[in-house]
């Protein structure tokens, strides 16, 4: 009986599913393709274009824009191009003195060796976290606008444990944001000092207070090189091409120093000796007569020191190091400028005290090379109440990693800085202050010709006989001969050396000139 009941249950179940089978058969029968339609060829082309556009619309998100590739420049045809001739004619418009006084390096481009080192560092890091760290350290507020980014590093942590957790991340963010900006400003100052002091000024050893991730190290390596200036390709410059023999970096911020060491791991250094230490030691001192090729420098570090006593101690260490050239750089803020002005005042005071002591040194005293044209009191320095800042600006062509870290599409940025370059020895004295060499350029020559033409007396035409011998008028002969002067008797090198000595007394523009208003120092 149980078996019969089970058979009836299965039979009823099969009857319930029969419509579904019939529906399946009907669907299968109607699934045959319809015969193709004979469409007009123009309509077929239109449908094909629409299909292609819809297919492209559903593709994956757009790929990021490609970066520019560095193509080696062929210098063989440089002299024959019209572009170079146009540049030379444009430079000839200025007088030699104006050209010497206005020479600058332009926008700074980070060498590929440094870019590759920083790119490798960023590749090994957490990029979203890197952007957050960069905003936390170098941006004021939550907005991603470029105007809120700064290059000052003044972070303070509550405990050593917190400092230890953040030091590697902070160092990576510093190398991605602050190092390129600091590098450009330091390069600008060193190149200007090199221009002002002449080809005889060479540096083989650098002592750096506030080394951080090595901004000064890289800038010094790319400023002092073995080849002549015409043969150097700065973008492809390598550490091995530098004439620097020794570098001492002094900094207590272990996180920044560790990143600075990592940036040098894959670089070929040859015989360059690099040392990192937490403080200045007595054995770092150099005898005074051996310091002619030694540079003592501190860049963007004075503002990070806790008080004036620490800043004063740093400046004294630079003076006692034995280096003949001392450079201090800080941000072009009120605080940064006051730090530079106070350091300048202290160095001049130490130099004056040394001259008055009567002790015999191989070189005594000191003087300001740049930017001041004097060794007197700074007219803009009023501690605590000053509003004016003696500052300068340097443009940097942003590498790709800077734009990506800041989430910005702008290809350049400007960094403001204040600085002073001090050199041991008394200030050069100009014996003849009335000489003004190199004051006439192409524009001045055209004006002189116009004045001569205006003074020329109009002469009447006379009949000329072929039998008469040609006679040159004395006035015409005098005009055709160049006027004698010191400029014509000097070679370009001699003229540049004379202008270099004369530039010690040239006034400096300390503010952007306004219409009919110029402020000089």
Question: Where in this protein do the model-derived segments appear?
Answer:
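Conserved SAM-binding loop of SAM-dependent methyltransferases across substrates and taxa
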Residues: 213-240
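Conserved class I S-adenosyl-L-methionine
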Residues: 201-212
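Class I SAM-dependent methyltransferase Rossmann-like catalytic core
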Residues: 158-198
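N-terminal mitochondrial targeting presequence
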Residues: 1-56
């Amino acid at each position: 009986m149980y078996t019969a009941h089970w058979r009836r249950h299965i039979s009823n179940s099969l009857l319930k599913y029969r419509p579904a089978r019939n529906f399946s058969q009907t669907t299968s029968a109607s699934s045959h393709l319809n015969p193709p339609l004979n469409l007009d060829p123009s309509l077929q082309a239109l449908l094909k274009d629409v299909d292609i556009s819809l297919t492209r619309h559903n593709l994956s998100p757009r790929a990021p824009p490609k970066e520019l590739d560095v193509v080696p420049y062929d210098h063989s045809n440089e002299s024959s191009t019209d572009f170079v001739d146009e540049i030379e004619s444009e430079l000839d418009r200025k007088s030699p003195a104006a050209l010497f006084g206005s020479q600058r390096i332009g926008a700074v481009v980070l060498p590929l060796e440094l870019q590759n080192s920083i790119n490798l560092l960023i590749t090994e890091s957490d990029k979203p976290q890197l952007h957050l760290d960069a905003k936390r350290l170098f941006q004021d507020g939550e907005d991603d606008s470029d105007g809120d980014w700064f290059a000052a590093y003044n972070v303070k942590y509550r405990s050593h444990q917190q400092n230890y957790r953040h030091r590697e991340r902070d160092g990576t963010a510093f190398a991605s944001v602050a190092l390129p900006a600091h590098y450009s400003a330091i390069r600008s100052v060193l190149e200007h000092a090199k221009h002002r002091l002449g080809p005889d000024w060479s540096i083989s050893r650098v002592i750096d207070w506030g080394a951080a991730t090595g901004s000064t190290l890289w800038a010094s390596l790319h400023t002092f090189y073995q080849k002549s200036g015409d043969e150097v390709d700065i973008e492809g410059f390598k550490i091995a091409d530098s004439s620097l023999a020794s570098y001492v970096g002094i900094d207590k911020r272990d996180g920044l120093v560790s990143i600075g060491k990592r940036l040098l791991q894959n670089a070929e250094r040859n015989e360059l000796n690099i040392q990192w230490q937490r403080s200045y030691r007595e054995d770092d001192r150099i005898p005074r007569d051996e310091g002619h090729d030694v540079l003592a420098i501190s860049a963007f570090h004075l503002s990070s020191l806790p008080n004036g006593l620490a800043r004063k101690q740093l400046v004294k260490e630079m003076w006692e190091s034995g280096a003949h050239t001392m450079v201090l750089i800080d941000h072009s803020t009120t605080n940064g400028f006051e730090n530079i002005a106070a350091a300048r005042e202290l160095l001049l005071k130490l130099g004056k005290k040394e001259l008055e002591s009567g002790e015999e040194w191989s070189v005594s005293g000191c003087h300001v090379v740049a930017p001041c044209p004097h060794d007197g009191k700074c007219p803009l320095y009023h501690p605590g109440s000053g509003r004016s800042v003696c500052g300068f600006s340097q443009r940097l062509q942003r590498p790709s990693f800077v734009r990506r870290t800041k989430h910005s599409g702008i290809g350049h940025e400007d960094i403001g800085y204040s600085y002073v370059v001090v050199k041991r020895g008394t200030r050069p004295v100009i014996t003849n202050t009335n000489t003004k060499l190199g004051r006439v350029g192409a524009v001045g020559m055209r004006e002189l010709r116009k004045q001569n033409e205006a003074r020329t007396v109009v002469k009447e035409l006379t009949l000329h006989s072929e039998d008469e011998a040609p006679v040159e008028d004395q006035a015409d002969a005098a005009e055709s001969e160049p006027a004698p002067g010191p400029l014509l008797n000097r070679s370009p090198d001699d003229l540049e050396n004379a202008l270099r000595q004369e530039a010690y007394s040239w006034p400096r523009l300390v503010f952007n000139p306004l219409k009919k208003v110029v402020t000089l120092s």
